[in-house]
Regions:
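Short, low-complexity, charge-dense intrinsically disordered segments
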Residues: 6-12
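N-terminal and secondary-structure boundary signal
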Residues: 2-3, 19-276
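Intrinsically disordered, low-complexity segments enriched in serine/threonine/proline/glycine
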Residues: 12-20
Length: 276
């Protein structure tokens, strides 16, 4: 595959998804200069950014959106002054030295606490994600000392809303939407961008039953393509560049047989989880 570096850096390479060559994938960043406020129309802001970049959405593109702007638009920013910590939150705060109000939010956003240590709380969120601090985050938010951002309540629904609204405004273009967040990983340092909500794309590409290059039949290989797309998008997003939206162009993804797709397909059942 060829990744156009000029597109990652903000260049102006154009072209339909179908005329870039079979082995070319483009990563196209879209900057949003204004801070997102509750009830902001993300579709309008994305279209404005596309116009400023002299770009457009094509059929088969993948629109990757950082959850932070979705959460802000959906009013998922919490004023910590309004949070009253429970006895459990105060107990954990005394042990770990973490703000008890943040702990209260983490517990509210979780259905199970797996463990906590050194200021990190590993939980199973209400969505089913296993992650640190339930995605509760104080970065890239105004007055971060007193505010925190939560994950969208239903990121699949958020992705579908963005997709349908943009399809209506782009003449019915058929593209996918992935909403992302950065998660840590067991046994490896560093975080990676992963999908937390999807629309118009199957999250897994299965090679089960296919033969490898030497004819051996594959039995278990399934690739979480939406996570890999999310990680590719992070190369252009970063954390400081005001690039919360990226277009991935040229990747041939599988569309769902039914109209809807769900991130829940990526969540491993507890009985198959060897790490808990």
């Amino acid at each position: 595959m060829v990744f156009h570096a000029d597109c990652v850096d903000g260049g102006e390479r154009k072209g339909d998804n179908n005329d870039n060559g079979k082995d070319t994938i483009q990563i196209i960043p879209l900057r949003l200069s204004a801070d997102i406020r509750p009830n902001d129309e993300l579709d309008t802001l994305i279209l404005r950014s596309l116009e400023q970049r002299q770009e457009q959405i094509f059929d088969n593109d993948v629109l990757v959106v950082a959850h932070k702007i979705v959460s802000k638009a959906e009013g998922r920013v919490v004023n910590l002054e309004h949070i009253k910590p429970s006895a459990e939150s105060l107990k954990i705060a005394a042990e770990d030295g973490k703000d008890a109000r943040i702990i209260e939010l983490i517990l509210d956003e979780s259905k199970d606490m797996i463990r906590h240590s050194n200021g990190v709380i590993i939980v199973e969120t209400r969505h089913g994600f296993i992650c640190a601090n339930a995605g509760v985050d104080q970065s890239n938010v105004e007055d971060s000392i007193n505010h925190a951002v939560l994950l969208p309540v239903d990121a699949d629904a958020s992705a579908n809303k963005i997709r349908e609204s943009l399809r209506e405004k782009t003449g019915g273009k058929d593209f996918a939407v992935i909403i992302t967040d950065t998660f840590g990983r067991p046994f490896r340092e560093g975080q990676t961008n992963v999908a937390i909500g999807i629309a118009g794309i199957e999250p897994i590409k299965s090679y089960v039953g296919s033969a490898d290059m030497y004819g051996k039949k594959l039995r278990v290989t399934e690739i979480a393509v939406v996570d890999e797309i999310a990680s590719a998008a992070e190369l252009a997003m970063g954390k400081l560049e005001r690039v919360p939206v990226v277009i991935i162009r040229g990747y041939k993804y599988q569309k769902p047989e039914k109209e809807s797709s769900a991130i829940s397909k990526l969540i491993r059942p507890k009985e198959k989880d060897l790490f808990r």
